[in-house]
Amino acid sequence: DTASEIGTNIIVVVNDNEMSIAENHGGLYKNLKLLRESNGQAELNFFKAMGFDYMYVEEGNDVSKLVEAFKKVKDIDHPIVVHIHSEKGHGYKPAVDNKENWHWSMPFNIEDGSLKNLSGGENISLMLGDWLLDEMKRDEKLVAIAAGVPRCYGYDKEKREQAGKQFIDVGIAEEEAVALASGMAKRGAHPVFSDFATFFQRTYDQLCQDLAVNGNPAVFNVLGASIYGMNDFTHICFFDIPMISHIPNLHYLAPTSYEELIAMEKWAINQDKYSIAIRVPEGPVVHSCEEYDTDYSDLNKFKMAHRGEKIAIIAVGNFFYKGEAVRLALANDGIDATLINPRYLSGVDEVMLERSEEHTSELQSRL
């Protein structure tokens, strides 16, 4: 609202297509709905309350109407909001019919909207979402939190309805999601907030101040965190380790497989001592028959998958199997390398590393 006090001809354009990514949540959207229904004439006007002049444009997909509106305001001598009512996906029937799915898309066939080059493989985020949905039936304190992208859990409208009050979408407000999770954990709930790694940058203050300072036992699933994840200019998913792992009292775990992920989830959700972030494996889903620990409260204790000599390979998360491939390649050359699954990104197992130094002359780290 500072802009309303500047006194210049700042023009704020609000593109109101009645959607967030999924459905909207929050009081602001109720006022937008009231303004749409009254053709911008409702006395209750959020923007005017902040000191802005206001203009409403109903036909937001009509270029001529938009040009007409902008001509009227381009030389105005005070701040104004131009509230434009548009349709998300306008002009392409598949996108209009399923607005949430078409917020973004992989390459598709323009004729019918079907996706090209479908891999048909498993999706670990969807699998995690289904597991959480099943857990909700056993744990009434468990609440899944999303920040405008419920489909990161695979939660379409039907699954959101199944979860009921055990699912909360705060809208595109990641800071609120972390603060909410922290407060819920403080009062004994089992909140789990899942989002893509690139969006956790928005939560840094809340992770440090609302969560970690208080040590509240909330759980945060960091999705797409890898060079395999989103990596364009505005959605970069591989800076999560330096950002999250150094925050005191926030413990960052890195499972290597789906089964290890679920083992860590079960522990993290049911313990009440630590703030936990989990780096969900990215790329093709890996399954393992290994028996994983059920208690991870012995913090920063690495796991030695294979003891060898001369070389130690530390392979983190979904790079563990690359480390295993390197170990096998070295074995073919007669070198028996040690392979370590660190499991924790926020600390170092000094005892294991010191023991490894006794048996190795080289330490190779793979992240």
Q: Whereabouts are the PLM-identified features?
A:
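Aromatic-enriched
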Residues: P284-K303
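Acidic, Ser/Thr-rich peripheral helices and adjacent loops at domain boundaries
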Residues: G27-Q41, N101-P107, I241-P242
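Single conserved hydrophobic/aromatic residue that forms the stacking wall/gate
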Residues: E358-L367
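Generic long, charged, amphipathic alpha-helical segments
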Residues: R160, Q166-V170, A305, G317, ...
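Thiamine diphosphate
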Residues: F52-A69, D75-I276, P284
